[in-house]
Amino acid sequence: SFSMLLAVSFASEQRIASLGGNAGFWEDDDQNIYMFPSTMHNFNIAQIDGNDDMAKASFLFGESTKYGFFMNSNSDELLNIAYGSGSWGLLVGFDTNSAKYTETDADDEEASSLNMKLAFGLSSSFRELGVNLNTHSIDNSEGDDPSSFAFGLNLRREQPIWEFSHMLVSFNFMSN
């Protein structure tokens, strides 16, 4: 129906997935903010997605200096902000989750997780650079507390070679 088509066409994640799955190829899409934080200067955003327990919201505003914050109701986001000035942008996130669950052969167990995110982007004459750092840890009562560290580097620029007009390079590393 028309309403379903309209909902899908305005949803960034679904739109990017249908176009190849990588927001880096579509410079004018707001999902680029997560790969290249300096692109936040191209957008003023007030988005609310959903009206249930899984609602998400994004707010980004300002002219020469950008301020913003993001909310995702499926985690206890203590801090998830955006700030940018001139040719650079910064995203900072600090999220926690906790849960109580019952195992079939044990008493109630409690587990909690902590996720810290930092992303920096710079636009220059060379083009756009994005760096992402993410650390995640889980604490439970079993003594085996998994953790991980992730590093990402993204580069996008005009690079006319043969029939190609642009270049997008992404490097991601994750340890656990």
For the regions a language model picked out, list residue spans one by one.
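Short, conserved acidic/polar surface loops in the N-terminal third of protein domains
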Residues: L78-N80, K100-D105
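Transmembrane beta-strands of outer-membrane beta-barrel pores
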Residues: G50-M54, M71-S75, F94-K100, S124, ...
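Bacterial N-terminal signal peptides
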Residues: S1-A7
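N-terminal, post-signal peptide beta-strand-biased segments of exported outer-membrane/organellar beta-barrel
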Residues: S9-N74
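Feature captures outer-membrane beta-barrel proteins of Gram-negative bacteria and organelles
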Residues: Y34-M40, M54-F70, E77-V92, S112-V131, ...
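Long, internal scaffold/assembly segments composed of regular secondary structure
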Residues: D144-N176
